[in-house]
């Protein structure tokens, strides 16, 4: 019998030696009003680095090899270049579109997210270098398939959200008025986005394989 497969991928970056004090509350300070602030919880603050207790016993992080990093960057940059050159119908050429680069500190924070073993955004993953780190999440289920194929499909699924978006959504970085999902696409092709990182977790819980996939970009 062929086991079903479930995959989630997490994108984020870090240069390993960690340089940020993740418990510095100023990293996650959000202004509510002139004199009103909220301090969000940082995913890296006091994190043990271990999988959550709710994870299946066989849950494990797949190594983010150089080959895998390059694949993620290649797919993203090709899709971003398509927009930059004005080859995506309904979207003008981009005045600037930086080539995405990898950052290991963000990848580390992405890894902490997937170690929750659930499809859920964390409240904050900012660093000293990246004050506005966004996050894309995805997962997939199905029959066994090569990791590279899964990664490509998930990234392209984010990009496919362009069918519900217009250039104005990108310029103002706003939600769709009718609630359609476009946020992954707008994060991917923002000209302010120049850094990306990833993490992949896989497990077989309840007769399923599960790979959480999350993406963190500087926005």
UniProtKB/Swiss-Prot annotation:
It is found in: Secreted. It holds the Pfam family CAP. Keywords: Allergen, Disulfide bond, Secreted, Signal. GO terms for cellular component: extracellular region. Expressed in salivary glands. Residues 73-211 form the SCP domain. Disulfide bonds join 23-45, 28-124, 55-117. Residues 1-19 form the signal peptide. InterPro entries: CAP_dom (IPR014044), CAP_sf (IPR035940), CRISP-related (IPR001283), P14a_insect (IPR034763). Belongs to the CRISP family. This is Antigen 5 like allergen Cul n 1. It comes from Culicoides nubeculosus.
């Amino acid at each position: 019998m062929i086991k079903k497969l479930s995959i989630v991928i997490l994108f984020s970056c870090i240069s390993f030696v960690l340089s940020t004090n993740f418990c510095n509350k100023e990293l996650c300070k959000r202004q509510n009003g002139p004199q009103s602030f909220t301090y969000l919880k940082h995913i890296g603050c006091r994190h043990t680095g271990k999988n959550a207790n709710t994870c299946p016993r066989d849950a494990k992080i797949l190594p983010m090899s150089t080959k895998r990093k390059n694949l993620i960057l290649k797919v993203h940059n090709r899709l971003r270049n398509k927009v930059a050159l004005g080859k995506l119908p309904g979207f003008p050429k981009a005045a600037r579109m930086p080539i995405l680069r990898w950052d290991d500190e963000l990848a580390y924070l992405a890894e902490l997210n997937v170690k929750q073993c659930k499809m859920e955004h964390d409240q904050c993953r900012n660093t000293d270098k990246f004050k506005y780190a966004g996050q894309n999440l995805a997962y997939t289920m199905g029959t066994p398939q090569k990791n590279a194929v899964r990664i490509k499909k998930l990234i392209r699924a984010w990009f496919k959200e362009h069918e519900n978006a217009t250039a104005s959504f990108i310029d103002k970085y706003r939600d769709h008025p009718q609630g359609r999902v476009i946020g992954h696409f707008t994060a991917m092709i923002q000209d302010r986005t120049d850094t990306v990182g990833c993490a992949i977790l896989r497990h077989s819980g309840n007769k399923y394989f599960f790979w959480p996939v999350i993406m963190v970009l500087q926005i």
